[in-house]
A protein has these predicted regions:
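Loop/turn elements at helix/coil->beta-strand transitions in domains of secreted/extracellular proteins
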Residues: 112-114
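Non-globular targeting/processing and membrane-anchoring segments
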Residues: 1-97, 103-108, 117-205
Length: 205
């Protein structure tokens, strides 16, 4: 299970007792990482909120929907910025790779903001993305934003992340990070191996 067939880096082999010592040492680092991640999650939740003043309208399956409509009776909303050129017959394969992980979450989670750009922004050569700017001509990028609606119906953006910041939402990458070969991607073209889930070729095909 890995994106490409390169062999993993050679590793030493040791008896079980020595392996267990090394594993327990790493476990202490993993626990520290978990504590740091929990602290970071608390800080993320404590970020100040930004009021959403603009009236956003989306093309829903049954017609136009406002940002408020997307809450569907809930107080919290997570929006994935999915790249889908209207001229294409399918959405971005990389965004689809992330979206494949969402369906299983939705039953549990149920009990365009700074990632798409107007023609004027693209023409200016400085569309804002990930608290920075993108190369000229780029019209949309992947990302994820979180919103909250208060009792008065006011909507606030509470968090956004982009690029490597969305890694935590991709279960496949979390598994690949556990195996000896890791993600094993071309550093100059990460995700070049990714296809829509029904468009992979069988090995040897």
């Amino acid at each position: 299970m890995a994106p490409n067939p390169r062999s993993p880096t050679p590793h030493s082999t040791v008896p079980r007792e020595q392996w267990l010592v090394a594993r327990l040492a790493l476990l202490q680092e993993e626990k520290e990482f978990t504590r740091l991640r929990d602290a970071l999650s608390r800080r993320r939740r404590e970020l100040p909120w930004e009021p959403v003043e603009k009236s956003y309208v989306f093309d829903g399956p049954d017609g136009p929907e406002s940002l408020s409509d997307l809450f569907a009776g809930t107080r919290q909303l997570v929006v994935y910025h999915f790249m889908f050129n209207p001229a294409d017959d399918a959405g971005c394969p990389h965004c689809s790779f992330w979206a494949d992980h969402f369906d299983g979450m939705l039953p549990h989670l149920r009990h365009d903001f700074g990632a798409s750009f107007t023609p004027a922004e693209v023409q200016s050569g400085k569309p804002l993305y990930n608290v920075g700017t993108l190369p000229p001509g780029v019209q949309d990028r992947e990302g994820l934003s979180v919103f909250f609606k208060d009792a008065d119906g006011r909507i606030f953006r509470t968090y956004s992340c982009y690029a490597r910041g969305i890694d935590m939402f991709n279960g496949t990458y979390q598994i690949l990070d556990l195996v000896p070969k890791g993600r094993d991607e071309d550093p100059e073209a990460t995700q070049s191996w990714v296809r829509h889930h029904d468009r992979y070729q069988e090995p040897g095909a």
